[in-house]
A protein has these predicted regions:
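Glycine-rich and polybasic anion-binding loops at the starts of cofactor/ligand-binding domains
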Residues: 1-180
Length: 180
């Protein structure tokens, strides 16, 4: 994917009305830094054995509303007894088929950002950190209440239908209160 394609997709993301404009400076700063350094190459010490050419050759699109399933997805092939599951399908949280244990609160990424007044912690250690911050488009937050014992594992299941090359950049937050 060329830098121009990333720039076009980034502008589409900024034009979305359902994201808080207060996040735009964080996004823009991260994207600007990504533009300056680009993808790692094999000349970078930590990436010398990693071939990233497939990332550059494909044209990825950000997930749009049209990418959300029109009906509840069948996840029966992914069922595991004794697990609570949170489902993200093509980048869209599926509340109807997601569950968490008692004492655990589940928020969407937007709800969590509002709760935290859009104060995001983010890393700038690699181009992928920057790209994820610039393109963060969804996500979930689990808040484990004070003195809560969670006896059931929670899994976050990401499903892509594979119909197109969708770029999904979720933010996952797990807040564990004291004594939990």
């Amino acid at each position: 994917m060329s830098l121009t394609n990333f720039q076009n997709e980034f502008q589409k993301l900024l034009d979305r009305k359902y994201f808080s404009p207060e996040l735009h400076p964080v996004r823009k700063d991260a994207f600007s830094k990504f533009e300056a350094i680009g993808f790692p190459t094999q000349k970078w010490e930590n990436w010398r054995f990693t071939n990233l050419s497939a990332l550059k050759e494909n044209h990825y699109l950000i997930s749009e509303v049209k990418d959300a399933p029109q009906k509840t997805p069948d996840i029966s092939n992914y069922k595991i007894e004794g697990l609570q599951t949170i489902v993200i399908y093509n980048g869209h949280f599926q509340q109807d088929i997601s569950s968490v244990p008692e004492g655990v609160q589940l928020l969407t990424g937007s709800e969590y950002n509002e709760l935290k007044n859009n104060q995001l912690n983010h890393s700038e250690k690699s181009p992928f950190d920057l790209l994820n911050t610039a393109f963060m488009d969804s996500g979930v937050c689990l808040i484990v209440g004070k003195n809560t014992i969670v006896g059931t594992p929670v899994r976050i299941l990401f499903i892509s239908d594979g119909d197109s090359s969708i770029m999904v950049n979720p933010r996952l937050h797990i807040d564990i209160e004291s004594g939990s």
